[in-house]
Amino acid sequence: MSKVAQQLKFLNKISATTRLPQILVDPKKYSGLRLTFQTKNHNGHMGARVFWHNYLPTLQFYNPRMKFDVIRIKNEDKQKSVPCKLEILSHEGSVVETIDMRNKMHEDIMKDLLDKIEHVPLPENEIIRVGPQESII
């Protein structure tokens, strides 16, 4: 696969093929999201890491006016507890809602976010696709 084809595939993963986070969040109501989790998978942090890797780029792509903070904590001690949470922030900087991401799959974290945040699903005609359309599917 050529470099251009790889880039198109990557861009479409962010904009077109990752469906669940294709939402529009009201930037007047929320200022952003803050994710806090550890760099390693132990103690139930794998779902948070996959959410960050797979879903956060799409959320950022379609909500460019929102701020997304990711706090990754280095923790080598499996006995030490590290927060694993997603916080929805107001414009005053206060936390509106908190989602505990520990021991959850990334899809469940995204569904919890959709339940707690006011949003509108992105209309099909507003989904951005790049390159030949047959290569996206």
Swiss-Prot record:
The UniProt record lists the keyword Coiled coil = no
GO biological process, alphabetically ordered: mitochondrial translation
Q: Which GO terms describe its molecular function?
A: structural constituent of ribosome
Report the subcellular localization.
Mitochondrion
Taking the first listed entry, what is the main subcellular location of this protein, grouped into a coarse class?
A: mitochondrion
Gene Ontology cellular-component terms listed: mitochondrial inner membrane; mitochondrial large ribosomal subunit; mitochondrion
The answer to whether UniProt assigns keyword Cytoplasm to this entry is: no
- Which keywords fit this entry according to its UniProt record? Mitochondrion, Ribonucleoprotein, Ribosomal protein
Subunit structure as annotated in this protein's UniProt entry: Component of the mitochondrial large ribosomal subunit (mt-LSU). Mature yeast 74S mitochondrial ribosomes consist of a small (37S) and a large (54S) subunit. The 37S small subunit contains a 15S ribosomal RNA (15S mt-rRNA) and 34 different proteins. The 54S large subunit contains a 21S rRNA (21S mt-rRNA) and 46 different proteins.
What this chain does, per the entry, is described as: Component of the mitochondrial ribosome (mitoribosome), a dedicated translation machinery responsible for the synthesis of mitochondrial genome-encoded proteins, including at least some of the essential transmembrane subunits of the mitochondrial respiratory chain. The mitoribosomes are attached to the mitochondrial inner membrane and translation products are cotranslationally integrated into the membrane. mL61 is not essential in cells grown at 30 degrees Celsius but is required for mitochondrial translation in cells grown at 18 degrees Celsius.
Similarity comment text for this entry: Belongs to the mitochondrion-specific ribosomal protein mL61 family.
Q: What is this protein called?
A: Large ribosomal subunit protein mL61
Source organism per UniProt = Saccharomyces cerevisiae (strain ATCC 204508 / S288c) (Baker's yeast)
